Structures are given as structure tokens and as C-alpha cells.
């Protein structure tokens, strides 16, 4: 890349339109804030590549959760999953919000982002040992690589900024590094102390942005943030479908168990389809108007992403139990699907849907659906199919209620569209 003026070119042939000359920028530029009202802001190819690499780590966490639950170690597996998933999600979230405010796409920014990607791949490589041997060296190292890279980005911001913005950037850089030192407890403390360390360090990590931005908020872009979260949700749901598909295929190929697996396959597909529908039924960027709203919404997505990925792990467990490879009961296997599904429905309702619903009937659709999904746990081999049908029925009910409301408002106020949603 260079900043020189390109040589003049011959005029285009008659009847054709000349392509615009590429914009030539310096390879190294100041890392300054982007405009919050910037038009046509969309996710960059680097951000999409970043997401795809992070899903590799999520897939590894899901695989280990399947093994733990299938071997009757659900409690230990869920705890390890929560800890590892927090590391993945928190590193992804910090990068996402930083990029929304400061992405200048210069050479150094790209290199540091690629270092963060390398970090999550190191973390992913250590997930199996964290679950099986309770050894967190690779997980800590991968997380440290990502956090040191992020701290460097904030120091670049501080170098270019002044006043309150510079103070904010320095607070971020220092907070990230201090928390990383705290996570050394994963390598030092006995196994019984790691859960307590997590309960202390996770809230401390989440306090860093709140403290850093108390005097000067970053200029994150609402539409860009909503798109980034939406794209990551799609990728996680895609990984859920991929994992469940592989499990069903293996069950059919190795055990010729199509009859036993068909209800799980159909129910799982309905659950994932409904999960996509209720998340994207209405754009959320209009709700993100302040840091307070953004923090609650962004932090709440830990539950959305973790439960969405856990649905795929649960479907794998249900398949293994159906073909006799899991050492758990049908009830436990069913709960592995229904509980994360219900949690996802509730989380999306709290973070998204309730802000746009009109009337008690609309507000109750997703909470009631979550309750019915939990009740379907007790339906034996039909539990997953029942949960899928309930999820699909929730979508249909919400859509019907919205259509009726729109029709009524159209009669009362012609020309005005309703904002109510499923």
C-alpha cells in the first residue's frame, strides 16, 4: 500500500464507465475513533474471518461438553464449559466493540487482529486437556495472547488520543493486563479453587469496560454492533446444525437407527430454525442508544451464545443416548436439549423481543414456550421432537398475534405500520 498518486490512465472506450480509482492509504495510520453516525457501516472481511476462527474454539468446547454429559459428568462438564466459553466470548466481545469504535484497517491493526486469532486457536487446542485433565496451561496461554494483543491496541489508541479519551484507553489497557495476571490462579490454585476464581475474575473482567468508559464512552456504531452480534449468532447456530448433522449421520451409518434418530433430527432442526427466527424477527440496533443499554445487551449475549452452542451439544448427546453409546438416562439426554433451548428462548426474550412486543399476549409467547419446552423433557424419546414443535408453535403464535395487531392498527390508523413483533 502506498500514498502516492496513481499514474493517469487512458480514457475508457465510448459507452463504458470508468471504474473508480482505488483509494490508496498509508500502511500505518493513527488509531483514532470512528464516527458513531457513520453511514453504510458493515462488518469487514477481517471481522468475519475472526468470527469463523472463534467458532473453532466454540466447537471444541461443545465436543467436550458432549463427552462430559454423555459420561454422566454433567455438573463438572457444564462448569468447565461455562469457564472456557467465557474466555472465548469475552475475547470476541472485547474485539468486536473495539473494532466498532476504532477499526482503521491498517497493517498493524490487521497483524494484531491475526495475533488474536492465533490466540483463540491456541486456546481451542487446550480445551480438551482442560476438560479431561483439568490442565489450563494452553487455555490460559491462548487467552493471554488475545488479551495482550487487545491491550496493545488500546495503547495505540492512547498514543493518538488526548484528554478523557486517552485516560479511557489507558484504563482499558491496564484493566486487561491486571485481569490477565489474576487468571494466573488457574495455573496455581488447586482444582477445587478454580470455580471460585472464575466467580471472582469474570465479574472483574466485565467491570473493566464500565470503569474505563465512565468519563468517556467509545464511539461504537449501533448498526455495526447489531450486525456483528447477529452474524456471530448465525455462525454459532450453523455450528449447532453441523454438529447435530454429523452425530445423526454417524448414528445412522454405525447403528442403522433411522427410526430412533428421526424424531431427534426433526425436533433439532425445528429448534434451530425457531432460534434463528426469534433472534432476527426485528432489528435491534434502534434499541442500543446508550452505554447502559449496550452493556446489558452485550453482556447478556453470553447466555445467548452459550445456550445456542449448547443446543448442538445436547442434540449430540441425545443421539448418542438413542443409539446406546451414552451412559445416561433418556431423561438426562432430553434435558441436555430442552434446558439450553428454554434458556435461549428466555434470553432472547429478555434482550430482544420484549422491547418491541405490544400487550400481555405477545409478551407471554416466549416465556410460556420456554416453560413448555422444559415440560417436554419428561416425554421420553419424543422430548426433542416435542421441544421442536413447541418452538415452532411459538414462532407461529407470535407471527399470528403480530399480524392481527397490524391489521387492527391499519384499520384504526391507515398508513401507519406497527412496531410489534413476534
State each model region's role:
Residues 1-11:
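N-terminal acidic, proline/glycine-rich, low-complexity intrinsically disordered segments
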Residues 52-67, 376-377:
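Alpha-helical transmembrane segments of multi-pass membrane proteins
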Residues 62-77, 100, 129:
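Short, hydrophobic transmembrane alpha-helix segments
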Residues 15-49, 53, 81-111, 118-130, ...:
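Predominantly late transmembrane helices and immediately cytosolic-facing juxtamembrane segments
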Residues 192-197, 380-391:
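Loop-to-transmembrane alpha-helix initiation sites
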Amino acid at each position: 500500500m502506498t500514498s502516492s498518486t496513481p499514474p493517469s490512465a487512458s480514457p475508457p472506450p465510448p459507452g463504458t464507465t470508468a471504474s473508480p480509482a482505488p483509494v490508496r492509504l498509508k500502511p500505518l495510520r493513527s488509531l483514532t475513533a470512528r464516527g458513531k453516525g457513520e453511514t453504510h457501516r458493515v462488518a469487514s472481511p477481517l471481522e468475519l474471518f475472526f468470527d469463523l476462527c472463534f467458532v473453532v474454539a466454540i466447537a471444541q468446547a461443545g465436543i467436550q461438553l458432549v463427552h462430559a454429559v454423555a459420561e454422566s459428568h454433567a455438573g463438572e462438564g457444564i462448569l468447565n464449559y461455562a469457564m472456557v466459553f467465557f474466555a472465548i466470548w469475552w475475547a470476541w466481545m472485547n474485539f468486536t466493540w473495539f473494532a466498532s469504535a476504532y477499526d482503521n484497517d491498517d497493517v498493524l491493526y490487521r497483524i494484531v487482529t491475526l495475533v488474536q486469532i492465533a490466540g483463540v486457536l491456541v486456546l481451542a487446542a487446550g480445551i480438551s486437556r482442560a476438560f479431561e485433565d483439568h490442565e489450563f496451561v494452553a487455555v490460559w496461554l491462548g487467552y493471554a495472547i488475545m488479551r495482550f494483543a487487545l491491550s496493545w491496541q488500546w495503547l495505540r489508541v492512547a498514543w493518538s488520543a488526548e484528554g478523557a479519551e486517552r485516560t479511557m484507553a489507558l484504563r482499558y489497557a491496564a484493566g486487561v493486563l491486571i485481569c490477565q495476571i489474576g487468571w494466573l490462579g488457574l495455573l496455581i490454585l488447586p482444582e477445587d479453587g478454580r470455580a471460585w476464581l472464575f466467580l471472582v475474575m469474570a465479574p472483574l473482567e466485565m467491570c473493566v469496560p464500565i470503569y474505563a468508559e465512565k468519563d468517556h464512552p467509545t464511539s461504537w456504531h449501533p448498526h455495526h454492533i447489531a450486525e456483528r452480534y447477529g452474524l456471530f449468532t448465525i455462525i454459532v447456530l450453523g455450528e449447532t446444525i453441523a454438529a447435530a448433522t454429523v452425530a445423526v449421520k454417524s448414528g445412522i451409518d454405525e447403528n442403522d437407527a433411522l427410526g430412533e434418530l428421526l424424531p431427534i433430527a426433526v425436533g433439532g432442526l425445528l429448534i434451530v430454525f425457531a432460534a434463528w427466527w426469534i433472534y432476527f424477527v426485528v432489528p435491534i440496533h434502534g434499541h442500543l442508544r446508550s452505554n447502559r443499554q449496550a452493556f446489558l445487551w452485550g453482556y447478556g449475549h453470553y447466555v445467548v451464545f452459550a445456550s445456542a452452542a449448547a443446543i448442538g451439544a445436547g442434540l449430540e448427546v441425545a443421539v448418542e443416548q438413542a443409539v446406546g453409546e451414552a451412559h445416561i438416562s433418556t431423561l438426562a439426554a432430553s434435558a441436555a436439549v430442552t434446558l439450553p433451548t428454554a434458556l435461549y428462548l428466555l434470553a432472547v426474550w429478555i434482550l430482544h423481543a420484549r422491547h418491541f412486543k405490544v400487550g400481555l399476549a405477545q409478551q407471554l409467547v416466549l416465556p410460556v414456550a420456554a416453560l413448555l419446552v422444559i415440560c417436554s423433557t419428561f416425554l421420553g424419546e419424543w422430548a426433542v421432537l416435542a421441544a421442536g414443535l413447541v418452538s415452532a408453535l411459538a414462532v407461529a403464535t407470535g407471527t399470528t398475534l403480530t399480524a392481527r395487531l397490524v391489521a387492527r392498527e391499519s384499520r384504526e390508523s391507515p398508513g401507519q405500520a406497527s412496531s410489534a413483533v413476534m
